[in-house]
Amino acid sequence: MVLWLQLALLALLLPTSLAQGEVRGKGTAQAHNSTRPALQRLSDHLLADYRKSVRPVRDWRKPTTVSIDAIVYAILSVDEKNQVLTTYIWYRQFWTDEFLQWNPEDFDNITKLSIPTDSIWVPDILINEFVDVGKSPNIPYVYVRHQGEVQNYKPLQVVTACSLDIYNFPFDVQNCSLTFTSWLHTIQDINISLWRLPEKVKSDKSVFMNQGEWELLGVLTEFLEFSDRESRGSFAEMKFYVVIRRRPLFYAVTLLLPSIFLMIVDIVGFYLPPDSGERVSFKITLLLGYSVFLIIVSDTLPATAIGTPLISVYFVVCMALLVISLAETILIVRLVHKQDLQQPVPLWLRHLVLERIAGLLCLGEQLTSHRGPATLQATKTDDFSGSTLLPAMGNHCGPLGGPQDLEKTSRGRGSPPPPPREASLAMCGLLQELASIRHFLEKREETREVARDWLRVGSVLDKLLFRVYLLAVLAYSITLVTLWSVWHYA
């Protein structure tokens, strides 16, 4: 009987002991959980059953909207030959993860948590123009807010293909696009939007390093929706147009100014006398110096397989003008240095150059004043050559100055007896020498007069070609300066 009473009492007390043990165990567990940091408890709570391979939406029909933003930090390089632009941007993207939401009151009012990027789902948004992997720092974490908003901030070194137009170099403006799009998901799964207003993105230069060769004019944005050729569906993409302009001061100093100075020196070289040989050697030296200058600056000029900058055409034309100037100088020197082998100036050439062209260039008075002393010198030479002396003495000699005619003349006129034969022969020899001297002086003066005529023709042609050359250089320079000014301030 007593045994039965003990068993009954034990049966009544056992459930009570078990209940107290459970209560004690729960209290111990709660005490143990309360000692863990809230960040750990929140991280374990969010990632306990999380699957990063599944798009984070509860309704699969609902697309995930990714808001993106980009700020240009620096223009690292512009490779015109390979058509590649390297930029450094601050990239930000935001999306809502419906599986990363919590109540801040349950976790010490934590509203924001950093989570490893490898532990959650991340949209596969890439840049279509990527041609190389940049050296971007690895940011292994993202921020998550309690509403489920994920913030992914990371700097990117972007190496992209860009169609660079170098025709206006060094006053060129380039427009390169960065197209952000999902590589796999259609717009029904991932949609893309702009995080900030387009006006703010366009004028944001707050972090741009503005000390380099390129100046950032603005960043334009455009949203597009396109379909692929395989009809997999429509894809959303956001384009950022990076508009940059080259600073031309360095190239103007190193390329344009030396070329301009050499052309000015070539123009000044026309003031050397056309009958001097120094002008030819001067022009050849100048042409050689310009060739060396082009060799030095050839590495500075951009080059592509599809286009040539206008400044290269400018250098080629300047070289051609120097060659034309040298050819003109050689022609003029050839005209004025024919010496005794030259023929008299043809009448048609004399009329065309010394009358028509000289009158057109207002050079008539200069030619008249230049010709006066020559004519006066010729008159003096004629007087000195014995033109008045020989007729007075020529009657005393025959054709060769013989004494026969002199004797006949003396007898016919009743003159005094002739001088001795030796004196007559000496006089005739003297007259013959005077005649030879006169003939030589006349021939030399004729040659000099022909040379002076050719010199006058060469001088007029030299002034004509100089003015034509000067007009060509000025017209070409004004055209290029106008084009470059329009491009620079457009």
Curated annotation (Swiss-Prot):
Give the signal peptide as a residue range, or say none if absent.
1-19
Its recorded reaction(s) are: Na(+)(in) = Na(+)(out); K(+)(in) = K(+)(out); Ca(2+)(in) = Ca(2+)(out); Mg(2+)(in) = Mg(2+)(out)
Q: From what superkingdom does this record's organism come?
A: Eukaryota
Q: Where do the record's glycosylation annotations fall on this chain?
A: N33, N109, N175, N191
Q: Where is this region: HA-stretch?
A: 426-462
**Which cellular component terms (GO) are annotated to the entry?**
postsynaptic membrane; synaptic vesicle membrane
How this chain sits in the membrane, per its record, is: Multi-pass membrane protein
Q: List the keywords (alphabetical).
A: Cell membrane, Disulfide bond, Glycoprotein, Ion channel, Ion transport, Ligand-gated ion channel, Membrane, Postsynaptic cell membrane, Receptor, Signal, Synapse, Transmembrane, Transmembrane helix, Transport
Residues spanning the membrane: 250-270, 286-306, 313-333, 468-488
Q: Which compartments is it annotated to reside in?
A: Postsynaptic cell membrane; Cell membrane
**Got any disulfides in this one, which pairs?**
C162-C176
Supply the Pfam families for this chain: Neur_chan_LBD, Neur_chan_memb
The residues on the Extracellular side of the membrane are: 20-249, 307-312, 489-490
Assembly and partners? Forms homopentameric as well as heteropentameric serotonin-activated cation-selective channel complexes with HTR3B or HTR3C or HTR3D or HTR3E. The homomeric complex is functional but exhibits low conductance with modified voltage dependence, and decreased agonist and antagonist affinity. Heteropentameric complexes display properties which resemble that of neuronal serotonin-activated channels in vivo. Interacts with RIC3.
- What is written about domains in the entry's comments? The HA-stretch region of HTR3A seems to be responsible for the low conductance of HTR3A homomers compared to that of HTR3A/HTR3B heteromers.
Cross-referenced NCBIfam families = LIC (TIGR00860)
- Family of this protein: Belongs to the ligand-gated ion channel (TC 1.A.9) family. 5-hydroxytryptamine receptor (TC 1.A.9.2) subfamily. HTR3A sub-subfamily.
Q: Tell me which PANTHER family the record gives.
A: NEUROTRANSMITTER GATED ION CHANNEL
Q: What does this protein do?
A: Forms serotonin (5-hydroxytryptamine/5-HT3)-activated cation-selective channel complexes, which when activated cause fast, depolarizing responses in neurons.
Tell me the protein's name. Answer: 5-hydroxytryptamine receptor 3A
Its lineage reads: Eukaryota, Metazoa, Chordata, Craniata, Vertebrata
Q: Please state the gene responsible for encoding this protein.
A: HTR3A
